[in-house]
């Protein structure tokens, strides 16, 4: 009887300990999503002021260098910028209501910066790395260039104010 009693205690103790493992269920879940946030881009205006129509060229002149300020909370790796516009022609922004012909008008060509000078043409809708980025930590400034040109017949251009918009999105990868 003593043998059975001595054997029962370890068997019962083992059953109790094992039953705790059997009843254990994963009841805590930890989840989320890691993201790299886009930069917050400040509004930028490039003002050509008065441009005489006869001084325009179809391929673009009246070059302006401009800067875009932004705050990038995540700034590790390589900055990628994408510029898009609603009205485009041949990789330029087509400025609406600047010609007597609706499909023609003033064009804005965009270029990357190359060590402060005009660089390669920017392909709208395609990410690129800015050639000139300045700033520390999260506060960044990129330099770009723009030129004015036109599509169609110069005689069809309409004198008056002009305005076009584009969207610039920047993030690091």
From Swiss-Prot:
Modified how: Overexpression of this protein in the absence of chaperone PapD leads to proteolysis of itself and CpxP; degradation requires both cpxP and degP, as well as the N-terminus of PapE.
Keywords, in A-Z order: Cell adhesion, Fimbrium, Secreted, Signal
SUPFAM superfamilies referenced in this protein's UniProt entry, alphabetically: Bacterial adhesins
UniProt-listed GO biological process terms: cell adhesion involved in single-species biofilm formation
Recorded superkingdom: Bacteria
Region forming the signal peptide: 1-24
GO cellular component: extracellular region; pilus
Gene3D superfamilies (alphabetical): Fimbrial-type adhesion domain (2.60.40.1090)
Localisation: Secreted; Fimbrium
UniProt-listed Pfam families: Fimbrial
Function: Repeated PapE subunits make up the thin (2 nm in diameter) tip fibrillum of the P pilus. Subunits are arranged in a open helical conformation. Pili with a defective papE gene have low adhesive capacity or none; however, the binding property of the whole cell is not affected. Pili are polar filaments radiating from the surface of the bacterium to a length of 0.5-1.5 micrometers and numbering 100-300 per cell, and enable bacteria to colonize the epithelium of specific host organs.
Subunit structure: Probably interacts with chaperone PapD. Assembly of the P pilus requires periplasmic chaperone PapD, in absence of the chaperone overexpression of this subunit is toxic, with PapE accumulating in the periplasm. Misfolded protein interacts with CpxP, which probably targets it for degradation.
PANTHER family listed in its UniProt record: FIMBRIAL SUBUNIT, FIMBRIAL SUBUNIT ELFA-RELATED
Further remark: Strains of E.coli that cause infection of the human urinary tract produce pap-pili (P pili) which are hair-like appendages consisting of about 1000 helically arranged subunits of the protein PapA. These pili mediate binding to digalactoside-containing glycolipids present on the epithelial cells which line the urinary tract.
Protein name according to UniProt: Fimbrial protein PapE
Species of provenance: Escherichia coli
Gene: papE
